[in-house]
Structure formats: C-alpha cells, structure tokens
Amino acid sequence: MPRVELEIPEDVDAEQDHLDITVEGDNGSVTRRLWYPDIDVSVDGDTVVIESDEDNAKTMSTIGTFQSHIENMFHGVTEGWEYGMEVFYSHFPMQVNVEGDEVVIENFLGEKAPRRAQIRGDTDVQIDGESVLLNGPDKEAVGQTAGDIEQLTRVKDKDTRVFQDGVYIVEKPGAGGA
C-alpha cells in the first residue's frame, strides 16, 4: 500500500474539501482538485497524506504527480512563482500596458488594433520599461499568462529572422522551484 506524507511548512494552512485541496500562505492561496481512482488525498494535522490501495505503475506515477502539485502549491504560497519577460522591437516601438485583468500590446508591427491577453488567476503583472515581471502563487496561472503573452506577439507569414519583434520569456523557474 503506497503512502506519501508531505509536511506542511510553517505559516501555511492546508484544508481539504472533498476532492479539493486549498493551501494558504503569505503570498495568497491556491486551490486544486486532486482526484484519481483508488487514490486518497487528505490533510491530517500538519501533514498531507497521499495513499492508495493499488500498487500498479499508473497509480504510483499519479501519486508522484500529486506530490509534485502539492509541493508546488506550498512553494507558491510561501515564496511565489516568478517569470521575467522582455519586450523586443526593431521597426515599430510597441507599448505594453496592463488594463484591468488584461495585458494590452499596442503598435505591434505597426498594427492599429491592440492585442490583448487575459491575466489568469492571482497573477501580478508589473511593467517597467521594456521588462515585464509576472509573479503569483499559482505556478500554472503565472506560466500560462506568460505563455499567452508570448504567443500574442508571434509573427506569422513573415521572415522571423528579420521580424524579431515580440515579448519573450527570458527567465522562468526551473524544476523543483529553483
């Protein structure tokens, strides 16, 4: 019977509501649904317990995946996740702004209509000149927001060796929250 116990860090609260695990800390809170047949995830005092009655390879790999998700949640609510992006342009100076819950890119390749990307979850976007900094407690929301912004400025139907304009990810967290 495989069983994994994860210690809940200090200054972090974890709660279970049926299939959802909520982790709260200084940087905010993250809720995630963790469900797979024959795998039980529970909060027991100061530990999160992942256990199963099955012992096959698929169940073991899913237990490892759940363990990584919970560790990422702990890291997010204590230290947070941070992505760095840079604005590059050579022909037309583009402006990048935050309007409400959207990132707005104006004058990309001289276009008249602005391009917009949704800011996901509790992601905080800070723009300082030509650098864009994204941070937040949810690894997936921060990473998806960064990816959406990068895809928003993808150059189509032009020679990408000449048209290198865009907003590119230049710094992202490595494996294990490094």
Regions inferred by a protein language model and the residue ranges of each:
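Ribosome-associated RNA-binding proteins
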Residues: 1-178
